[in-house]
């Protein structure tokens, strides 16, 4: 989640939480992890107790979400983090803060791309384009050259010169719009 400043991005995140259904989030998490959070008190600190999977998520969030270092990771706090974009690592802040986080992941893990999730549509995408893209572009880490300029994702991914349509050996090739 990105905005003009770290404070504005955090405020945006906090604002979105008012729309989250934490009971529903707990149910989803139970399905994802096999852990029923109802078995834990609201005061347990998941940074130190509970399943290892939750402790790993807490460590990832603490490393990437500004202002969370040293916080007590109670059940309500864990559910709030899960409610907006799930269990994924989060990058919340100004363009510089978010770009620093993404660049650290690139450097440390050698990754060459991201699947960015969204909290609202088109809002999250508009914020990325308005705030984050210029910062990444200025750093030279925003990919803008592709094998087929203006081509489809399929053309870019396959890079086989066969155009944007599904390939003949794909089941969908039997169907076309006429």
Language model feature labels by segment:
Residues 121-142:
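C-terminal helical cap(s) of enzyme catalytic domains, especially alpha/beta-barrels
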Residues 94-125:
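C-terminal, well-structured subdomains that either form a transmembrane helix-short loop-helix hairpin
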Residues 1-106, 136-178:
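An alpha-helical appendage that flanks or caps ligand/catalytic pockets
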């Amino acid at each position: 989640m990105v905005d003009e400043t770290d404070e504005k991005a955090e405020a945006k995140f906090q604002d979105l939480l008012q729309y989250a259904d934490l009971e529903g989030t707990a149910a989803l998490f139970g399905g994802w992890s096999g852990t029923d959070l109802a078995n834990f008190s609201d005061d347990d600190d998941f940074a130190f107790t509970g399943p290892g999977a939750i402790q790993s998520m807490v460590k990832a969030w603490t490393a990437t979400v500004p202002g969370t270092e040293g916080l007590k990771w109670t059940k309500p706090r864990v559910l709030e983090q899960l409610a907006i974009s799930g269990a994924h690592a989060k990058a919340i802040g100004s363009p510089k803060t978010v770009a620093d986080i993404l660049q650290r992941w690139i450097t440390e893990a050698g990754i060459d791309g991201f699947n960015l999730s969204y909290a609202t549509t088109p809002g999250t995408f508009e914020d990325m384009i308005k705030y984050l893209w210029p910062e990444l572009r200025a750093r030279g880490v925003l990919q803008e050259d592709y094998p087929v300029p203006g081509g489809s994702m399929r053309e870019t991914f396959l890079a086989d010169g066969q155009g944007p349509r599904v390939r003949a050996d794909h089941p969908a090739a039997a169907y076309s719009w006429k």
